[in-house]
Amino acid sequence: MPKNSHFSQKILTWFEISGRHDLPWQQHKKEQSDIYAVWLSEIMLQQTQVSTVIPYFQRFIAKFPTVIDLAAADWDEVANLWAGLGYYARAKNLHQGAKQVVDFIKHTGNFPQSVDQWQTIKGVGQSTAGAIVAMGVRGFGVICDGNVKRVLSRWAMISDDINKTATQKQLWQLAQALTPKHDSGKYAQAMMDLGATICTKNRPKCTLCPISADCQAYQKANPINYPVKNKS
C-alpha cells in the first residue's frame, strides 16, 4: 500500500489545472449549490457517458427546473424526456424519488442533508448519496463509484477480485481514508474526472496522472490488469 500523504492535494491540484470545469451540473464554482441538479446528474451518469448525458440533463432542467416540478409531472412526460438514455428504471426511481424529496422538504424545510437520509430516497445508493452530500449539500461525503474503484484498485494494486464483498469493503475504507474533510465536493468531482479522462479502463494515460509516482500498478505491474475480476 502506497503512502496516503498528499494524495488528495495532488488530485485537487490536477483538477484545478487539467480537470473539466464546464459540465452543466458542476457546482464547485457556484456560491450556492443546486442539490437537485447534482442528484439529477448523478442518476443520469450511472453507466452512461458524460457526452450522452449533457443534452438530456439540459432538457430535463429546462422542463423540470425544480424537484417540485419533477414530482408534479406525469410519468409519461418524464419517460418521453428520458427516451434514448436507457436503463429506464433510473427514470422511474428518479420520479418516485422526487416525490419523496418533496415530502421530505414539506416536513423539514430542506432537502435531505446526510448520506443516511439520501439513501432512503428511491434509487440512491451509498456512492450516489455521498456524491450528493459532497457536491450538493457541501458536507462530508465519500464516493466510491466505478471510476473511483478503478483509480484506487490501481493505486493500491489491490489483487483480490473486485466483486468480492471483502474487496468492496476495502475499497470503501480506502476511499473514506483518502477523502479530505474539507473540499470533499471538489475532491469527488476530481476523482470522477480522473477516472473518466485519465485512469480509463483500456488506455490509461498514466504519464499524465497526478498520482502515477505512487501508483503501485503503474510502478510494478500493468494498470490494465486492475481492478482484478476473476472469472467465475
Language-model features and meaning:
Residues M1:
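Residues lining hydrophobic/aromatic ligand-binding pockets adjacent to catalytic sites
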Residues H6-I17:
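Thiotemplate assembly-line natural product biosynthesis machinery
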Residues K10-I11, L178-T179, N230-K231:
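Intrinsically disordered, low-complexity boundary segments flanking structured domains
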Residues E16-K205, I211-K220, I224:
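Catalytic cores of DNA base-excision repair glycosylases
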Residues N222-S232:
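Short cysteine/histidine-rich metal-coordination sites, predominantly Zn2+-binding motifs
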